[in-house]
Amino acid sequence: MSDTIARPAETARTLPRILPPMAMLAELTHRCPLACPYCSNPIALTQAKEELSTEEWTGVFAQAADLGVLHLHLSGGEPAARRDLVELTQAASSLGLYTNLITSGVGLTEARMNSLADAGLDHIQLSIQGVSPESADRIGGYKGGYERKMAVAGWAADAAIPLTLNAVCHRQNMGEIDEMIELAIRLKARRIEVATVQFHGWAERNKEVLMPTREQVECATRTVAEAREKYQGILVIDYVPADYYSKYPKACMGGWGRVGLNVTPSGRVLPCHAAETIPSLSFENVRENSLSSIWYESNAFNAYRGEDWMPELCRSCERKKVDFGGCRCQAMALAGDASATDPVCIRSPLRDRLTLEVEQLSAPSVVPMNYRGRA
């Protein structure tokens, strides 16, 4: 695709007032025992020898706390692949950061879960790929993964750590959403996030087998609405719908450089998980610059803040403060221009072409899933 929207003339930019970030995603490692075909991590994974050390990560956490970060998400890859996970959790907790562990469950034991609880872990977010050993292990590419997840959920409950289930949904498992919600109830989770796959990183290679159909998306939306009513006050159900079938794009990350930031395993600081797919941007590293200077002053974080960068189609739109122009990485992937109107938007001149491509991708296919390799 190529964008046909005229760009605003190059003028001095006016940046909005920049507030401190509320949340930070710490990608502790890219190592992971699973081989999920929907993995959104980059094609080229960071190797273990390139990862930030224990001391470097604890220093980053201290900077984050000083910067004003409240929520720290410990992620990966699989964060349990880090031998120092308990130590890192304790360091973050001692700084007053709310800690959320985002995990596949593989690599955790009951003893380690208890150690994490003692270290001050506030919350655990457990991924599920399906509602049975057959579907979950097939999608995750890891035999025995489902049973391990069920054990981890039980250990979390025993340790009094609040639980969220994270269900990434796509064509292969979208018919299980109602059962996923029921599973969350049985596991006494407080929340479930039903999130449609985002086609970044490795997932881009599996579009033909993962793209849901329009009928699946409509059914999923109804299922979530009915479950929200049924379990109101019992289970929080967050829903990230398939934006390819929506009229308007999502407010990705709450707007570029507005709410949170990501730190990669090697220390690069990003406005969002997939930001490195934008080739025109260069991202600074916490090994060389402070988190504060990167957040407030770096060219990458300021690139899409405010409205001056927007094409006229977005700058003149009443939704510009609702979706902030949509996803910059999606614009890069679909339009070849990170400054373009997100092609998902019904007002984009590329929307009709995108709709046709999605219909073709969601058609029945015999293409096998391309499983993620391991770092």
Swiss-Prot record:
Residues 18-235 form the Radical SAM core domain. Its EC number is 1.21.98.4. It comes from Rhizobium meliloti (strain 1021). Binds 1 [4Fe-4S] cluster. The cluster is coordinated with 3 cysteines and an exchangeable S-adenosyl-L-methionine. [4Fe-4S] cluster binds at C32, C36, C39. It catalyses: [PQQ precursor protein] + S-adenosyl-L-methionine = E-Y cross-linked-[PQQ precursor protein] + 5'-deoxyadenosine + L-methionine + H(+). One of its GO terms (molecular function) is S-adenosyl-L-methionine binding. Catalyzes the cross-linking of a glutamate residue and a tyrosine residue in the PqqA protein as part of the biosynthesis of pyrroloquinoline quinone (PQQ). Pathway: Cofactor biosynthesis; pyrroloquinoline quinone biosynthesis. Belongs to the radical SAM superfamily. PqqE family. PANTHER family: PQQA PEPTIDE CYCLASE, RADICAL SAM DOMAIN PROTEIN. The keyword Iron-sulfur applies. Its cofactor is [4Fe-4S] cluster. GO terms for biological process: pyrroloquinoline quinone biosynthetic process. This is PqqA peptide cyclase. It is an enzyme of class 1 (oxidoreductase). Interacts with PqqD. The interaction is necessary for activity of PqqE. The keyword Mitochondrion does not apply. Keywords: 4Fe-4S, Iron, Iron-sulfur, Metal-binding, Oxidoreductase, Plasmid, PQQ biosynthesis, S-adenosyl-L-methionine.
